[in-house]
Amino acid sequence: MKFQYKEDHPFEYRKKEGEKIRKKYPDRVPVIVEKAPKARVPDLDKRKYLVPSDLTVGQFYFLIRKRIHLRPEDALFFFVNNTIPPTSATMGQLYEDNHEEDYFLYVAYSDESVYGK
């Protein structure tokens, strides 16, 4: 998926910002969250998050669901590198395994469990 954040900010800027965030907040991880193409869920009001490393993916789902005002019966799926992460993993684990060279973790969200292009 093409992330708008990457389109809006050149790599060097993102890398410098990612490094600065990791130094200043070692117990938190920088995450970019954007809606997947063709997803029929609302847009987020912001896409950059600084998340506690020990927050679980399940807790992060809850946080994002609240921000986009999803009803309990509405489905929501996260994708990290085109894969749905386990809800029991911590955001710190997910970050360590999947962050990009700019020190950001990129998460796409959708109402579909299949990653659309």
Curated annotation (Swiss-Prot):
Found, by tissue, as follows:
Ubiquitous. Expressed at very high levels in the brain, heart, peripheral blood leukocytes, liver, kidney, placenta and skeletal muscle. Expressed at very low levels in thymus and small intestine. In the brain, expression is particularly intense in motoneurons in the embryo and in neurons involved in somatomotor and neuroendocrine functions in the adult, particularly in the substantia nigra pars compacta.
Q: What organism does the record attribute this protein to? A: Homo sapiens (Human)
Q: How does it sit in the membrane?
A: Lipid-anchor
Subunit organization:
Interacts with ATG13, OPRK1, RB1CC1 and ULK1. Interacts with TP53INP1 and TP53INP2. Directly interacts with SQSTM1. Interacts with ATG3, ATG7 and MAP15. Interacts with TECPR2. Interacts with TBC1D5. Interacts with MAPK15. Interacts with TRIM5. Interacts with MEFV and TRIM21. Interacts with WDFY3. Interacts with the reticulophagy receptor TEX264. Interacts with UBA5. Interacts with KBTBD6 and KBTBD7; the interaction is direct. Interacts with reticulophagy regulators RETREG1, RETREG2 and RETREG3. Interacts with IRGM. Interacts with DNM2. Interacts with NCOA4 (via C-terminus). (Microbial infection) Interacts with Kaposi's sarcoma-associated herpesvirus protein VIRF-1.
Report the protein name in the record.
Answer: Gamma-aminobutyric acid receptor-associated protein-like 1
Can you locate the Phosphatidylethanolamine amidated glycine lipid attachment residues? G116
Report whether Zinc shows up as a keyword of the record. Answer: no
**What family is this protein classified in?**
Belongs to the ATG8 family.
